[in-house]
Amino acid sequence: MKKAQTNKPAFTMYPKSVKILGEYKHNVLKQSKNAKLSKDRLPVVKKGQFKGYVIYTLTLEERATCPRECYHWDDCYGNNMMFAHRIQHGPELEKRIKAEVAELCGTYRGVIVRLHVLGDFYSVDYVELWQYLLAKFDNLAVWGFTGRSYSSDIGLAIRAVIGGFGARFSVRFSNAPDVAFSANSADLYQPEKGKSLICPEQTGKSE
């Protein structure tokens, strides 16, 4: 890693890409454009419990919302996402999420939100917002990853939502090999037979 890529401050390399919500006229929840997830005009889950759910994503500002101990603090893939719309986090975002989730869940049979393309859960109150929304809308689901410590205040809040909603809140703790529901970097931990597996996308075995 180059010297310029280490010890980055707690904000994105692309501050002009952070969208101030008072000036932002677009929705904060975006339909997924990731061809690995869906190539359809309306991106939907193809198999499993959430088959038919429409896929949405939320992108926050990397590092500004992330724990400093994140293994990928310096080499976050957001470093290569110059044009991503990073949504300003805070109370206005949470207000917008409430309104947009209500509209989407009233429109589609099911909605599943990827948290977060960039960024992380930034407060206990923010985690509890998703807990509230999952309780209110039974056709809502969430999946994603967090760099928060399993035992931190935010980590404990995330665990509480997982415990309450199971697969509807499929958030994995990153680089926490002692946690059953975790996602671990291959350069840190080798998969153990019977305990872990490599994502099929990484081995070319996905459909």
Task: Annotate each PLM feature.
Residues 1-207:
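Class I S-adenosyl-L-methionine
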